[in-house]
Amino acid sequence: MAEQEQLGDVRLYRIPIEVTVAARSQKQVALLRQPAVRVENLLRLRIGPGDVDGPLQRLLVTRNRPAEGLGLALPAGKVATFAMRDGRRILIGEGRIDDHTIGEKVEITIGTATGVRARQRSVPGTTDAYDLTVTNDLAETQTVEVELPLDSWSLKGGKLVKREGWMLWRVNVPANGRRELRYRIKM
């Protein structure tokens, strides 16, 4: 594993073994191998007005701190996530992260969710009301976040909260179940 050093405000990662890199080439080495990092596994969808029918993105969310199994400055780059199934390590997904300092929130999009879909349709006879349905065909409850743009909207309905410029609907969708939200926009 690489060892972190600091030179002023620049972080260096020294590789503890000799490595040869040919001219105009690159070499990948593991920066970090953590057997257990505490993460929240959730699904997210960002939508605007109009019809939507499709899958959601699967994210892993954590804080970059020792209590969660991290706690070092993380440089931008690729991330691979694995899980143990029947005694074997299997790839769950791959994503990218930006630079993250210690204590910062880390979100990694690791792919498209299977078995969970969102469908939004305008309510017949209206121009400002929408029905949003999230269905879960999986055998486990899934935590879903739907983000609706806040800028020119006035949203009414459901349990919506403001977060980072978005209206957020966060819901647990039961196994083989669905959750619905009806909301209105005012432009």
Q: Which residues make up each language-model segment?
A:
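Long, intrinsically disordered, low-complexity accessory segments associated with secretion
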Residues: M1-M187
